[in-house]
Amino acid sequence: MNMIPAARLLVACALLAAPLPLMVLAGCKSNDAVGPAAHAPVVSAAAKAAAQMPDEDTPPPEKTGGFDGKRAFADVAKQVDFGPRPSGSQAIAQVQDYILSELSSYGCTPDVDAFTAETPAGQIAMKNILVKIPGDRPGIILLATHYDTKKIADFVGADDAGSSTAVMLELARLLCAQRGRYQVWIAFFDGEEAVNLQWKDPDNRYGSRQMAAKLAISGDLAKIRAFLLADIVGSRELRIKRDANSDKMLTDLMWTVAKNLGYSGVFVNDPTAIEDDHQSFSTRGVRTVDVIDLEIPYWHTPQDTLDKISSKSLAVVGHV
């Protein structure tokens, strides 16, 4: 059977029907020490221009189940063009319109949840976007990303979180066109980033906490068989470690899929521990896995620009 990107994993995730005991797990923050490189290398003008284009060795869609890494790269570029996109800004409103327009063009029917978040900076208007793709059975596979950027001067967030937003848009393009065994929902969260400089609860994960609470009230939270979060997945030297705060069974499954596809060099077995949007759901008993490379030297710096993004990396993550 020829499966679209993520289909192997989505089918396998649907088998994880056993309830998960309620956990309290530890946007995006790692226990590992990371930071910007002390000195940026000197790069020629030609090299800089080339870095603004998709990689020549990006695998074609026919090799990645239909996922088009170059299309995803273009989605990253479009987000970067809007500039810094912190929650409540004019730029994030433009991104919201872009996401909604793209989803509608794919035949998806996006739902928008507009809400007001209480933050250290006062009330901020935010929006979650959710696509519900029907399936033949009631179980739900939830794919997710955040689309806001950290409020830092000149921070355009090509990787954090332009890359994962682009991956989810490309998956929506493929998945909205067909009906699967289980429902697939794709969520775009606002407000993952802390408003203050430091990540401290409750100043983070505004959008994912909002959605998890609403789904708990509606009863849909109990129908989620697996929650797959992507965040910071576009690096040219992508290395995704196993998150100790993700469900072990689901992590094992994803890493096995990656190995079988030949991506063991990207999905590595080194451990890490990440605080991210997945914990809004894992603390409510949902099986979750976080796909993220937080050990990038340009994390939360103005150097998180389009030239750091690899269309090949986007294709690899989308394929898995």
Locations of the language-model features?
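Acidic/histidine-rich catalytic neighborhood of metal-dependent amide-processing enzymes
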Residues: 151-253, 262, 270-273, 278
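N-terminal capping segment at the start of a domain
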Residues: 49-93, 106, 148-149, 297-305
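A non-catalytic alpha/beta surface segment that caps or lines the substrate-entry region
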Residues: 78-136
